[in-house]
From Swiss-Prot:
GO biological process: cellular response to hydrogen peroxide; hydrogen peroxide catabolic process
Reaction catalysis annotation: H2O2 + AH2 = A + 2 H2O; 2 H2O2 = O2 + 2 H2O
Gene: katG
The protein's name: Catalase-peroxidase
Cofactor binding, note field: Binds 1 heme b (iron(II)-protoporphyrin IX) group per monomer.
Binding site for heme b: H282
Cross-linked sites for Tryptophyl-tyrosyl-methioninium (Trp-Tyr) (with M-267): W95-Y241
Quaternary structure and partners: Homodimer or homotetramer.
Length: 751
């Protein structure tokens, strides 16, 4: 029986360097705090005081662009350029860097250079992009830290377009590299490449390696109605968007259009932008499927040391050039694959299309009764008939896409402008506000998806004004906890993923944020009314043009309330405050895009409950990661907000104190009190009741977002620091520091 052991003859696993059975192997559902410890100075090799913006601005930008332009036609023997031009490859590299972005949590995208790391560097959709980045290395090496990989990959895509005759909309630098894989992103629950059995209720199990998906239409009749799991924006594990062969490999252009519309919308693209991107991008280059994927070796993360980070070694022919295998599809869209023109759209409507197979066995389409006039990438004596992908034909056979495609065909200038704008949005959507943009090619035009905020056009309030305004705020008669809740509600919309949200703009007073359940509209309205009255009184009294924005007042009111709460608890402390925020208008606020930022849960305010899949404490950690908080910062903020009585609905859950409204460490003291016994209250496991162990009398109620700080070993260790007798002062100091951090997360104008 020994020969049937599943581990028989397997090489022993390493027993050093963190190998062996890990905690997550024993307890796979354990709350993971690792995502709160990423991208710190520990993993960053650059000097702590390195200023990337200053380094980028010292770059000879146009010399860099010239070097990139020259690279486009400098074909290398080790990885030859299709048609003698790397443009198509580099467009794909930039697209796939930016195209992982999704709107629900702002994660993904090209803003951190994550394509260099697992899993993205080994996704089936990113085959051969390891070569693209290696082609760029001599240029990255030349310019060093003056340009990040994140910026370089996007800029190279721009230069590729320009080198083939397309006028781009512009380019903004400012993407800082990270130095490790971002483990905060949920890419899906599938365990095989190209699978979608988790993201769809009747999905496809996938395969163990990249290549053509074997279609089985009988098993996938829901492709016209299925719903993609949130927050995902890709139809298969390891793909950027959709399966180019069609849903689950079924060559159905209409069903494919449904997948396209869903995935592109989740990346913030409307139908016109979607058509422009597909038709514009497929004007250039080709796909690669010279033979079966059986010839293709392991992805970079599974390749041997000698491969030096390259993957997908190809045993077919030379393994490169004409023998390249990437997607398994073999399509060159136009007769001029290195020039911008209308050929893609012209062919789309000129020909009738017949289903065929690529040399690798993938579903694709060939023009019926057409002559062979498409050039071969490596043999000038060869010509091919026009071919298309299933997802290309979606632009013709989906009624809405067809209407847009025909308009673009009849109006070339509209097509070019739409593609330029959509490409800029694709490659800059995750950069946040324009204040982060740097470089000489930043477009002057302000775009609605950039969440614009007016520039400061008046003197800001002084220290004397700040002190007077604090007194006015505390004299309004509004419970200070409402000012704290309002400030938190405003600032905590920030997402470190795509740099959206935050207190600047005061969008908390506008639709849709003012109506979010978590913001408790009656309480919010009372706080805002009091602050608006103070704003009107202050501004009308000025004769030198000085103004205070509501955005500044919202944050200042929260700071004043925190200072009062600390003082009431016996601690005199000043909460840092920097004026200069401005108020956005409703016209500057895209309601639909902001609706996607509405929190499902906010454990800092004890809002939301567990789902069948996600316990509430996991939502709390996810929120903390989006706020760029460490585990200690998350801990001290939750404990402080409970003491300050800042639950979204005014409930007593987690308010473990007899003096709510004072900034005390009572939350931790009472949470750690062994005289309290906890049990679930009611039928669910979201609300708990704490009783006195001796008398059985009820003492407290709590949520999972409260009790996790006593249950989770690492969080309990932090809680013990703040719950100790000598932890009171440290608690107040650390709370104020973490509070100030959150209030200023979006202040790219001063940070």
């Amino acid at each position: 029986m020994a020969d049937k052991c599943p581990f028989h003859n397997q090489a022993p696993k390493p027993n050093v360097a963190g190998s062996g059975t890990q905690n997550r192997d024993w307890w796979p559902d354990q709350l993971k705090l690792n995502i709160l410890r990423q991208h710190t100075t520990v993993s960053n090799p650059l000097d702590p005081d390195f200023d990337y913006a200053a380094a980028f601005n010292s770059l000879d930008y146009y010399a860099l662009k010239k070097d990139l332009q020259d690279l486009m036609t400098d074909s290398q023997d080790w990885w030859p350029a299709d048609f003698g031009h790397y443009g198509g490859l580099f467009i794909r590299m930039a697209w796939h860097s930016a195209g992982t972005y999704r709107t629900f949590d702002g994660r993904g995208g090209g803003g951190q250079g994550q394509q260099r790391f697992a899993p993205l560097n080994s996704w089936p959709d990113n085959v051969s992009l390891d070569k693209a980045r290696r082609l760029l290395w001599p240029i990255k090496q030349k310019y060093g830290n003056k340009i990040s990989w994140a910026d370089l990959m996007i800029l190279t895509g721009n230069v590729a377009l320009e080198s083939m005759g397309f006028k781009t909309f512009g380019f903004a630098g400012g993407r800082k590299d990270t130095w490790e894989a971002d483990e905060s992103v949920y890419w899906g629950g599938e365990t095989t490449w190209l699978g979608n059995d988790v993201r769809y209720s009747h999905g496809f199990a996938g395969s163990s390696k990249h290549g053509a998906v074997i279609a089985d239409e009988a098993s996938h009749r829901d492709i016209h109605s299925r719903e993609l799991e949130k927050p995902l924006a890709a139809a298969h594990m390891g793909l950027i968007y959709v399966n180019p062969e069609g849903p689950d490999g079924n060559p159905d252009p209409v069903a494919a259009a449904r997948d396209i519309r869903t995935t592109f919308a989740r990346m913030a693209m409307n139908d016109e932008e979607t058509v422009a991107l597909i038709a514009g991008g497929h004007t250039f280059g080709k796909t690669h499927g010279a033979a079966s994927s059986d010839h293709v070796g392991s992805e970079p993360e599974a390749a041997g040391l000698e491969a030096q980070g390259l993957g997908w070694q190809n045993s077919h022919g030379s393994g490169k050039g004409a023998h390249t295998i990437t997607s398994g599809l073999e399509v060159t869209w136009t007769k001029t694959p290195t020039q911008w023109n209308l050929n893609f759209l012209e062919y789309l409507f000129r020909f009738e299309w017949v289903l065929t197979k690529s040399p690798a066995g993938a579903n694709q389409w060939v023009a019926k009764d057409a002559d062979a006039f498409i050039p071969d990438a490596y043999d000038s004596s060869k010509k091919h008939r026009p071919q298309m992908l299933t997802t290309d034909l979606s632009l013709r056979f989906d009624p809405a896409y067809e209407k847009i495609s025909r308009r673009f065909l009849e109006n070339p200038d509209q097509f070019a402008e739409a593609f330029a704008r959509a490409w800029f949005k694709l490659t800059h959507r995750d950069m946040g506000p324009r204040a982060r943009y740097i470089g000489p090619e930043v477009p002057a035009e302000e775009l609605s998806w950039q969440d614009p905020i007016p520039a400061v056009n008046h003197p800001v309030i002084s220290e004397t004004d700040i002190a007077a305004l604090k007194r006015d705020i505390l004299a309004t008669g509004v419970d200070p906890s409402k000012f704290i809740s309002t400030a938190w509600a405003s600032a905590s919309t920030f997402r470190g993923s795509d740099k959206r949200g935050g207190a600047n703009g005061a969008r908390i007073r506008l639709a849709p944020q003012r109506d979010w359940e978590v913001n408790n509209q009656p309480w919010l309205a009372a706080a805002l009314k009091a602050l608006e009255d103070i704003q009107d009184k202050f501004n009308s009294a000025q004769n030198d043009g000085k103004r205070v924005s509501l955005a500044d007042l919202i944050v200042l009111a929260g700071c004043a309330a925190v200072e009062k709460a600390a003082s009431d608890a016996g601690h005199i402390i000043t909460v840092p405050f920097t004026p200069g925020r401005m108020d956005a208008s409703q016209d500057q606020t895209d309601v639909e895009s902001f609706n996607q930022m509405e929190p499902v849960a906010d454990g800092f305010r004890n809002y939301g409950t567990s789902t069948a899949r996600v316990p509430a404490e996991h939502y709390l950690v996810d929120k903390a990661q989006l706020l760029t908080l460490s585990a200690p910062e998350m801990t001290v903020l939750v404990g402080g907000l409970r003491a300050l009585n800042a639950n979204y609905d005014g409930s007593a859950h987690g308010v473990f104190t007899t003096r709510p409204g004072q900034l005390t460490n009572d939350f931790f003291v009472n949470l750690l009190d062994m005289n309290t016994s906890w049990k679930a209250s009611g039928s669910g496991n979201d609300i708990y009741e704490g009783t006195d162990r001796r008398t059985g009398s009820k003492k407290w109620t709590a949520t999972r977002a409260d009790l996790v700080f006593g249950s989770h070993a690492e969080l309990r260790a932090i809680a013990e620091v703040y719950g100790s007798s000598d932890g009171k002062g440290k608690f107040v100091k650390d709370f104020v520091a973490a509070w100030a951090k959150v209030m200023n997360l979006d202040r790219f104008d001063v940070n």
